[in-house]
């Protein structure tokens, strides 16, 4: 991520949910999902970020 988007920071906003804020089928209840934002708020990065996560084994 640092090489692809210099200066952009990622922030994890949620990784586990036990309060019922997500849909019934959400992987947050199993600790297998994460909500992330980018410091530049560019949502166009999210598809590439998802691909990078899969390539890294997430």
Swiss-Prot record:
GO cellular component, one term: extracellular space
Compartments where located: Cell membrane; Secreted, Extracellular space
Domain of life per record: Eukaryota
UniProt entry keywords in alphabetical sequence: Autocatalytic cleavage, Calcium, Cell membrane, Developmental protein, Hydrolase, Lipoprotein, Membrane, Metal-binding, Palmitate, Protease, Secreted, Zinc
Protein residues bound to Ca(2+) 2: 14, 17, 19
InterPro entries: Hedgehog, Hedgehog_sig/DD-Pept_Zn-bd_sf, Hedgehog_Signaling, Hedgehog_signalling_dom
Processing and modification events after translation: The C-terminal domain displays an autoproteolysis activity and a cholesterol transferase activity. Both activities result in the cleavage of the full-length protein and covalent attachment of a cholesterol moiety to the C-terminal of the newly generated N-terminal fragment (N-product). The N-product is the active species in both local and long-range signaling, whereas the C-product has no signaling activity.
GO biological process, one term: cell fate specification
Major localization listed first in the record, in broad terms: membrane
GO molecular function, a single term: calcium ion binding
Gene3D superfamilies listed in its UniProt record: 3.30.1380.10
Positions annotated to bind Ca(2+) 1: 13-14
Binding of Zn(2+), residues: 28, 35
Coiled-coil zones: none
Domain remark from Swiss-Prot or TrEMBL: The indian hedgehog protein N-product binds calcium and zinc ions; this stabilizes the protein fold and is essential for protein-protein interactions mediated by this domain.
PANTHER family linked: HEDGEHOG, INDIAN HEDGEHOG PROTEIN
Function field: Intercellular signal essential for a variety of patterning events during development.
Protein family per UniProt: Belongs to the hedgehog family.
Name of the protein in its database record: Indian hedgehog protein
């Amino acid at each position: 991520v640092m090489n692809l988007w210099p200066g952009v920071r990622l922030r994890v906003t949620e990784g586990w949910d036990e309060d019922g804020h997500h849909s019934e089928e959400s992987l947050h209840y199993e600790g297998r999902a994460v909500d992330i934002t980018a410091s530049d708020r560019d949502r166009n990065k999210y598809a590439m970020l998802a691909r990078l996560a899969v390539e890294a084994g997430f």
